[in-house]
Structure formats: C-alpha cells, structure tokens
C-alpha cells in the first residue's frame, strides 16, 4: 500500500476515509459527514486533547468532512479548504450551519449581540471567515450586518459578498498583518505562522495554497535564482520550515517566531540570522507570476 501524507489524507490504523479504500489499510472506512464551522475560530489539533499541539485552525463558515466523533467531544476530520486533517472540537462544528453569503475583509470583525458597537462584543471574526448575513440595521449612522440565526451583528463595511472580486495584490493583503502575533499553527489574524500568512494572503487574491511551507514550496509558482539581485515583490523565499514574502528587491515580510510577530526586515539579515541559528540556507525562491 502507498504511503500518503497524513496531513492531507485521513487515515489511521483503525479508520480511514472511504475514498482511500484500496490505497491504505485500515480496520474500517467511513464516507464522512460534511459539517460547517460555527465557532469564530476552531483549533485543529494533532491529538484529541486540549493540550495537544495546534497544527492549524479553521474559521467560521469553512466545511469539514468528519469521519469520527468521540464521547469526549472531539471530531476527527479533514478541513475541505486545504485538506488538512486533525482533531476539531465537536461543538465548533454543525451539520446545520447556515450557508455563508459574505466573507470578512477586516483583520478583526467584532461580533456584537445586536447592531450597536457600544454593546459588549461577544466574539471576533478573522479575515477570510465566511458568514451568513440576513439583513441590515443602522444605529447612530453606522450600518450593521445581521448574522443568521440571531447570532449578532457585525459592522457591514467589514464584509463583502462571497462573489465580490478578489484582491488584486496579495502582498498588500499580507502587509495588513504587520505586527500580528506569531502563533505556531495559527491561521487567523488573531495569531498566525509563516505559512498561514502566505496562505491567507493568497486566498484573498483567489489563489489556493497548501497549509505548510514544504507543501507550498512544491505547489506554488516557478523557481527563480535565489539571488538577492533577482528577487522582486511577491516572490516567496523558502527555508526548511519557513517562508517569507518579498515586498521589493530588499525587504521581506514574514511571520517570525524569532520576533514573535509579523515583521519586515532586510532579506540579507534574515538569511544571515536563520543560518546562524541552524535553519540553513534559503532552499528556493518561488515566483507566482
């Protein structure tokens, strides 16, 4: 039987995705049930425990193919946006979630219990989350979008219809994350890692990207010479386990664990520091256009 990447294929010794029958061995196979993320943000963990490693996150409105739910409140499934497999909190998912109509375009969109920003926010939606909006209301000159199911309201200007044109410049989207906190496994504007910065920014420009750096390096763009004199805006610079986005021929934007945030720094300085700390040389530069 073939060895498949467990990050992108749902299989264990005891259970596997029915679509993998004949490809991997398992005691049983399941077709899975599609559920929608109803939490603002849902953790995806390596194991069914709240203290297990955070491998990624799912945002409201995304769909998950669930293969198993445990009595302890965990759902083992696959995020359909990028194929990532892991354990989700069961209460963050619903088979009856409303079909999204809009996507969030603000870095953070607070959710209020009603159409009034003076009410205490009950949560917050990150950039790229998808929501179902059923109407509008105006309070003191500010227009609010009303969420389906009476779940509250957001400022209407912070969301656009799903069919709205994508962003033209993914680098400009990435720059909006400047100073956002670094979070290993994070995939939202509340905290994210280097590959999530690339994935989210490209998603706003209608470009699908894998979740992890090694997968991105294989899938995105074409290789160009890893030479500081030849890089330009939008190029992706990869290391083993890291990626950054070039703003121009000199400066790079990246979610840096060293700096604990999204930062801009000269590419040359990043290359020297990463090598000095044992991260090796840049492995490739990829150009999307």
Predicted regions, residues:
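Low-complexity, Gly/Ser/Thr/Pro-rich intrinsically disordered linker/tail segments
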Residues: 272-289
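Loop/turn positions that initiate beta-strands
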Residues: 61, 122-133, 233-234
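Short, basic/aromatic beta-hairpin or loop at an interaction surface
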Residues: 31-45, 98-112, 203-219
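...with weaker cross-activation on analogous glycine-rich loops/strands in unrelated enzymes
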Residues: 207-268
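Boundary regions of SH3-family modules and the immediately adjacent low-complexity/disordered segments
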Residues: 1-33, 49, 62-65, 72, ...
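Active-site nucleophilic cysteine motif
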Residues: 174, 186-205, 209-210
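Short alpha-helix capping/helix-loop boundary micro-motifs
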Residues: 47-53, 111-121, 218-228
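Short, well-ordered loop/turn sites that connect or cap secondary structure elements
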Residues: 52, 58, 125, 230-231, ...
